[in-house]
């Protein structure tokens, strides 16, 4: 049963975000919406809800269709509203009292603890705020559910919980979701739409298989274009040769033949379409200055504690060696970020290092945290690069342009940049530090899929030694060659991440 029919849809905001978009949404569809940051995913969802008028095309919806849209952020008027009330207020006022049981059902399905339900939204973590917005949307039982980056701010446990929740929805409820989490897309979708400025292909496959099909289609298109252009070139050469013979011999027949060959060449050239070339959001490059040290960090049963001294776990005897790409696994609150912080302190200020943590003196640290706190919101990208790395204005601007920063962006306060733009600036800062050891806490948080894959490639191509924390399962599987797990207040080495993923349902 067709619920939404999108025909020849296009939106132009300066440049075309997408055009000639055709999509039929049927009962039971679970559609993954994939595009780079700022390329129109949220815009398309806004067109479907009717809050944005497209530049061209039309959207037809089934009579009486209701659409639930879970946006990326909590509306400011709801900040002071308790979790439970924020969901209750989504019901019609005349039903709020008699139908309040529906709120309880939704909150139970999302495993929201009783204590959490009475807390104002502004006091909750980003992950719980996302779940509050999801509950607020679903309590009204919409016919179609739209989710915009639903895994943002969620830890692995909550991502697995959200996957289970989505897969337990009534089978006929269509879901359209935008996400950069490849494993999440694979677990929750059965169709994939790749949003592009011209043709936006759709595949009846989850992300990974759809991406393989897309890459093959693009490669086939590139081969066809190259073949057509070669044939056109040959036709033009034949036409030029015949033209010379025709002029010298005065043959009208050869002149006509020449014209026909040129027309065939023009027809081929006009019809030939170059293969899609993704416009990069900016290059991500890393560096590795190397070190002669074999062992970079030694842990001798160090106690990892909270700032007030509460023991989280003990490390046992562990070594970080050159070439290691260690992924630190553990539940939320186990102490992953705390260990990263203690390692950072031991490398940057050895005299203040905790007992049991020793870093080789030749280490040069490349550090990135999930909040990108190392980048001051009041500073500008151009100011950051010039001051930190003693480069001139022209060189700094060239570096920023290579990272995808326009002239306007370079002079903006960093606090006004998008998460993706800040992440790429952070990666440039890492590269210019020329480290030989990386400490990365949730490095893919604000990166689109292209950025994630580039970061994976750079870490492996440079044989960079690193210790990282990430809830991105695809990234962990691609990058890690050693895995440490925090379990029962001990740090233990495990063969791979799959056992941990399975334990949290991921």
Short names for language-model regions:
Residues 1-221, 291-506:
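ABC ATP-binding cassette signature C-motif
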Residues 3, 95-96, 213-314:
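Flexible nucleotide-interacting loop at or near the entrance of a catalytic core
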């Amino acid at each position: 049963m067709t619920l939404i029919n999108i025909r020849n849809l296009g939106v132009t905001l300066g440049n075309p975000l997408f055009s000639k978009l055709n999509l039929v949404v049927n009962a039971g569809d679970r559609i993954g919406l994939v595009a780079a940051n700022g390329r129109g995913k949220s815009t398309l969802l806004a067109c479907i809800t009717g809050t944005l008028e497209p530049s061209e095309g039309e959207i037809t919806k089934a009579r009486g269709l209701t659409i639930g849209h879970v946006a990326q952020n909590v509306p400011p008027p709801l900040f002071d509203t308790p979790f439970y009330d924020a969901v209750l207020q989504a019901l019609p006022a005349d039903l709020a009292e008699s139908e309040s049981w529906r709120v309880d059902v939704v909150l139970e399905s999302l495993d929201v603890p009783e204590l959490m339900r009475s807390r104002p939204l502004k006091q909750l973590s980003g992950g719980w705020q996302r779940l509050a917005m999801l509950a607020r949307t679903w309590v009204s039982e919409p016919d179609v559910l739209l989710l915009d980056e639903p895994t943002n701010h969620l830890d692995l446990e909550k991502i697995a919980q959200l996957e289970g929740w989505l897969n337990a929805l009534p089978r006929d409820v269509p879901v359209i979701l935008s996400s950069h989490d490849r494993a999440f897309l694979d677990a929750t979708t059965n169709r994939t739409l790749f949003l592009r400025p011209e043709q936006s292909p759709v595949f009846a496959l989850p992300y990974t298989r759809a991406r393989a099909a897309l890459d093959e289609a693009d490669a086939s298109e590139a081969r066809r274009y190259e073949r057509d252009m070669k044939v056109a070139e040959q036709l033009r050469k034949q036409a030029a040769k015949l033209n010379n013979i025709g002029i010298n011999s005065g043959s009208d027949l050869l002149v006509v033949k020449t014209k026909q060959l040129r027309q065939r060449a023009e027809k081929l050239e006009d019809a030939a379409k170059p293969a899609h070339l993704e416009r990069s959001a900016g290059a991500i490059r890393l560096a590795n200055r190397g070190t002669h040290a074999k062992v970079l960090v030694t842990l001798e049963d160090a106690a990892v504690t909270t700032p007030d001294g509460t023991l989280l776990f003990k490390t046992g005897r562990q070594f970080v060696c050159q070439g290691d790409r260690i992924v630190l696994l553990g539940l939320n609150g186990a102490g992953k970020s705390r260990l990263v912080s203690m390692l950072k302190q031991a490398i940057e200020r050895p005299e203040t290092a905790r007992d049991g943590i020793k870093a080789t003196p030749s280490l040069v640290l490349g550090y990135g945290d999930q909040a990108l706190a190392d980048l001051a919101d009041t500073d500008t990208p151009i100011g950051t690069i010039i001051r930190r790395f003693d480069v001139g204005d022209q060189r700094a601007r060239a570096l920023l342009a290579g990272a995808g920063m326009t002239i306007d962006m370079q002079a903006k306060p960093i606090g006004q940049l998008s998460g993706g733009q800040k992440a790429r600036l952070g990666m440039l800062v890492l590269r210019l530090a020329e480290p030989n050891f990386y400490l990365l806490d949730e490095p893919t948080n604000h990166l689109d899929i292209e950025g994630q894959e580039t970061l994976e490639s750079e870490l492996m191509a440079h044989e960079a030694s690193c210790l990282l924390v990430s809830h991105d399962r695809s990234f962990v599987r691609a990058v890690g060659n050693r895995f440490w797990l925090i379990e029962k207040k001990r740090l233990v080495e495990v063969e791979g991440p799959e056992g941990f993923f399975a334990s949290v349902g991921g």
